[in-house]
Amino acid sequence: MMPSSQRPSPRGSRQSPSPDQRGRIAFAILATLVVAVLLLTLFSHAPSGQPLGYSTFIHDVQAKQVRTAVLNNTTGQITGSLTNGTAYSVTGPLPYTSSELSTLSKAHVQVSYITPGPGIASTIIEYVIFFGIFIGIWVYLTRRTQGSVNGIMSVGRSRAKTYTTERPKTTFDDVAGYQGVKGEVKEVVDFLRDPSRFSQLGARIPKGILLVGPPGTGKTLLARAVAGEAGVPFMSVSGSDFMEMFVGVGAARVRDLFQTARRQSPSIIFIDEIDSIGRKRGTGLGGGHDEREQTLNQMLSEMDGFDPAEGIVVMAATNRPDILDPALLRPGRFDRQIVVPLPDLPERLAILQVHTRGKRLAPDVDLEVMAKGTPGMSGADLANLVNEAALNAVRRGATDIAMADFDSARDRIIMGQRREATILSDEEKERVAFHEGGHAVLAYVLDYSDPVHKVTILPTGMALGVTQQLPERDRHLYPREYIEDTLVVRMGGRVAELLVYGDLSTGAANDLQGNTELARRMVREWGMSERLGPMAWGSQNVVFLGEDLLHSAEYSDRTARLVDEEVERILREQEERATELLRQHLPGLIAVAHALLERETISGEEVGRLVDEAAGHPIHPDGKRVLPIAKLPEYAELEQFTVTNGNNHAASHDDTDPVS
């Protein structure tokens, strides 16, 4: 896949030299003239006759062997003839002294003087320098003028890059997993390659395909794979490339892009981050016209307007489909909206296999185990994981990548980089140990919480300590028990400090913030409040101009007060649960805290062993409870929701930093 270049001119046609070539030719001619003049000057001033030393010349004068002497007042050169007729030349000092002239006069030498003006060589040099400077200034100003004119005239031209399939860099084989997504995209590619197979049944090619999904899931990679396999011109452009400081530039670039695509039809246009120009239309902050709207209107007209584009497929990618204009999403423009979700376990394994291809792996590396331990990671996260593992192997001087490198890379991505320079006092380290121990103990004893993977009191990322949990499987639906246990685990650090020290620190700031947001979503969005019942008001997203700026509250002040009361009730109930559980397992909390103070980092298995030994019996003799089948929701069409940030990343409690 290479950027297309200009077509070669017909054989035998003469092409005018480019400005750079003309500049090089002029420089070569000027340099040749300068060298010629210098050589001419050198040879024109070469002395003639037998060269003599100045002392020898004075001796010959005193011996009356010199007949004539011509003195050059400019160069100090003396030429003439001896009494025997031999010509000579000598260079004397300037100015000539009276004693020297008296010596010549006493010897009866015929003396004459010359004061030559500037020679032809000097004149040529002066003219060459003058005209060289003039030509240089003229060329510079000409180029500046042409650049300004070209810049102004080309401001409305599209910045799309056109690719051919002579050397495809990315194919569908490089896109691991996502068989359903690749099937949807391959159908469009097959249509462009062989449209007759579809037109026999009256099928028409989709005009637009919108790739929707979280960041890093491979939407742009799919587009590059289409460019590598389509066999038709593929034009790639970013949504931000349409916008410029001049009014009307965005619409002009849209027109130019589609005109170029029509000339090369059938073709594919890919617009990355289309939400930068496709945002919902509405009144701006000052009531004025938005340049983005003009660009969007031109895009709508080109895709399916009075003069629709035929033989052109528009692909676009975004992770914000909720803010796109409805007119852009209707059938006839973007006929298909393909969701590119976070990869599941088999897809994560396939992605890891693709990114480890060509890398030297140690025998102990098990990619399936690593795929199970990375739920919620996108394809970009997994690529970064493999690269971090390779860098870790290089840092320790190994010749291959071991499983320990992958574990270290995963911890670095989820928990953050360890801060070697941060040194805690003994009192701070002990408080952090009990704080993280509270998280870890509750995560172990609760039935529905995610298992503990690792606990550390080493300053990592922005935190002073981290308790890392890894889900046992990919979750697509979250029961109420899981959400409540998540609230209890987050309360563990705060409650542990209260039980051990009798007071609080700033370490629980992130815990409280996350719990408050989660409890508010339970009440506002998921209908998990008996007092408010089955009502939902949506999340409090960022305000977008022209859409949410003038919206009023969706509920009354009384309802808002009820929401706050229910959020407070949920948080206090889960805090009481956390307090009761930690009082029951206080010996286990002390054992875990002492282990952290001794070794600084312990595994989830060691946390379970310490808690079981302190309790005198296994807390989970048959393993952790899972959600019974009978309690699963009966309606498959229930909308999936997520607990935090819309994804299923491994949880980590990194909230013991006072900065938070």
Curated annotation (Swiss-Prot):
The chain crosses the membrane at residues 25-45, 119-139. Its EC number is 3.4.24.-. It is a multi-pass membrane protein. Acts as a processive, ATP-dependent zinc metallopeptidase for both cytoplasmic and membrane proteins. Plays a role in the quality control of integral membrane proteins. InterPro entries: AAA+_ATPase, AAA_lid_3, ATPase_AAA_core, ATPase_AAA_CS, FtsH, P-loop_NTPase, Pept_M41_FtsH_extracell, Peptidase_M41. Keywords: ATP-binding, Cell membrane, Hydrolase, Membrane, Metal-binding, Metalloprotease, Nucleotide-binding, Protease, Transmembrane, Transmembrane helix, Zinc. It comes from the Bacteria. The gene is ftsH. The active site is at E436. GO terms for biological process: protein catabolic process; proteolysis. PROSITE patterns: AAA (PS00674). Homohexamer. It is an enzyme of class 3 (hydrolase). GO terms for molecular function: ATP binding; ATP hydrolysis activity; ATP-dependent peptidase activity; metalloendopeptidase activity; zinc ion binding. Residues 1-24, 140-660 are cytoplasmic. Binds 1 zinc ion per subunit. ATP binds at G213, P214, P215, G216, T217, G218, K219, T220. This is ATP-dependent zinc metalloprotease FtsH. In the central section; belongs to the AAA ATPase family. In the C-terminal section; belongs to the peptidase M41 family. Residues 46-118 are extracellular. Residues 1-20 are annotated as: Disordered. SMART domains: AAA. Zn(2+) binds at H435, H439, D511. HAMAP family: FtsH.
